[in-house]
Amino acid sequence: MGSTMEPPGGAYLHLGAVTSPVGTARMLQLAFGCTTFSLVAHRGGFGGVQGTFCMAAWGFCFAFSVLVVACEFTKLHSCLRLSWGNFTAAFAMLATLLCATAAVIYPLYFTRLECPPEPAGCMVRNFRLAASVFAGLLFLAYAAEVALTRARPGQVASYMATVSGLLKIVQAFVACIIFGALVHESRYGRYVATQWCVAVYSLCFMATVAVVVLSVMGHTAGLGCPFDRLVIVYTFLAVLLYLSAAVIWPVFCFDPKYGEPGRPADCLRGSCPWDSQLVVAIFTYVNLLLYIVDLAYSQRIRFVPTL
């Protein structure tokens, strides 16, 4: 009996998935990711929240890169109920951010030029230095994929491959940094005004994630309203909400009437509320800028939701 699963074009494997420029970048991601993970796990070592985050980031990116390469090479992605172009663009951007963060954190917390005062200390140092180098190369490999797949002017592309789509991933990532600072001794519950800021961060984060999920799942066509128009309206509202938080949060955290204008001298490093409040303030302005840029780009994009 003949097979009912004949692949399009008569070929079961797609060699371009590993030989094209994007495919080459993905193969480098696998090589650098496996090398970085192995160097740290074998002898480099890690510990604490920072080390666990780095290992989790590298492991997550490596696992999904294997999935992407395998699906493209075997053409199985055509069987998945999602928009493959949106999925790969969103993952590449997220992996770039995760690997960039890990490439900064691991050398900062674990790498030293001098040898540790322990047996085989110089070997541990060398492994950590090598892991730091490959972590940087891993970030560059993911950044290269983002650059290669990003939609160009006049090009028909999926939403997540546009500047606006990529910015959605960055906005959600920055919001996660804000949430991390909020739960770390930020004292946001002292005033209703700062609680409003937390509500703003949460609402915008959930809406941004919803936009990404709808795009990746390919469900943007059944919303009853043009998806690009909904995105523009939401982005405009997010700019207004973040603008309010950008004014309210610094006032209620750093004005002498409500908080501390400067870092208290008795504030312990690693558990200082003022530090967390400063991180929230900085990344509030970062996300405000990202939403403004997103709004500007959203006026000009045209995308195909099913790619």
Swiss-Prot record:
Its main location: membrane. Coiled coil: none annotated. The keyword Transmembrane applies. Residues 17-154, 159-303 form the MARVEL domain. It is a multi-pass membrane protein. InterPro entries: Marvel, MYADM-like. The keyword Nucleotidyltransferase does not apply. It is found in: Membrane. The chain crosses the membrane at residues 53-73, 90-110, 129-149, 163-183, 198-218, 232-252, 278-298. Keywords: Membrane, Repeat, Transmembrane, Transmembrane helix. It comes from the Eukaryota. GO terms for cellular component: cytoplasm; membrane. Belongs to the MAL family. This is Myeloid-associated differentiation marker-like protein 2. It comes from Mus musculus (Mouse).
